[in-house]
């Protein structure tokens, strides 16, 4: 894929973007993680009670109006346009044929799809639907232990009132990200920073989408694009513009130079 590629992810998506940056090193020129689900074992999924909340959450209503009212109540802090989009795309009719009445209505994404983000569906392999040991997904904790392996500039964008990106969590993210100090390419600048959006919670991109977009654009435009255009992209263009003959000549000169160093 042609660079630059910028990774942006929220919550579990932030964890997945960060994981991809480690497993496919240098795939991203930079990444922006919005309130990512990344933390040590004492801050892992087993401690948050998300599975219990998911199983208790209502997912079906008799009418579309009832479903819309429930969503508008649950997500009342969201930006109105974002909330309208959620309602438009997250509710569907359960009717089995055109002869049936419109209702009932359910969420497009059911409990199971959400639950397996938090708890491993071990019954799929064992065939036993009861009596299985409860095993939580370990992705957020795994990524926490891999933060030192990150090699691209990283911005943590956090909600000021979020219960996930607490001051302690942000301190750990900033201190551990890219801490192993892998050798840098010429011109490479590896930054780690944070920005806080006041009066927002974990759903900050849905609550204040414009402010989040402005912060992300500022990070990309003022810093990352300049670095790319002035250094990394320019160096890559020099190599791409060389003929195969000149590339081979450069490689031979480089290997001869290495003989005096190794």
UniProtKB/Swiss-Prot annotation:
Presence of keyword ATP-binding: no
Induction of its expression: Expression is positively regulated by CSN5 during infection.
Subcellular location: Peroxisome
Motif (Peroxisomal targeting signal type 1): 260-262
Molecular functions per Gene Ontology: hydrolase activity
Principal EC category: hydrolase
Misc: Gene clusters encoding host-selective toxins (HSTs) are localized on conditionally dispensable chromosomes (CDCs), also called supernumerary chromosomes, where they are present in multiple copies. The CDCs are not essential for saprophytic growth but controls host-selective pathogenicity. Although conventional disruption of ACTT2 could not be accomplished due to the high number of the copies identified in the genome, the high sequence identity among these copies of ACTT2 is likely an advantage for RNA silencing, because it allows knockdown of all copies of this gene simultaneously.
Biological function: Abhydrolase domain-containing protein; part of the gene clusters that mediate the biosynthesis of the host-selective toxins (HSTs) ACT-toxins responsible for brown spot of tangerine disease by the tangerine pathotype which affects tangerines and mandarins. ACT-toxins consist of three moieties, 9,10-epoxy-8-hydroxy-9-methyl-decatrienoic acid (EDA), valine and a polyketide. ACT-toxin I is toxic to both citrus and pear; toxin II the 5''-deoxy derivative of ACT-toxin I, is highly toxic to pear and slightly toxic to citrus.
Family: Belongs to the AB hydrolase superfamily. AKT2 hydrolase family.
Protein name in the entry: Abhydrolase domain-containing protein ACTT2
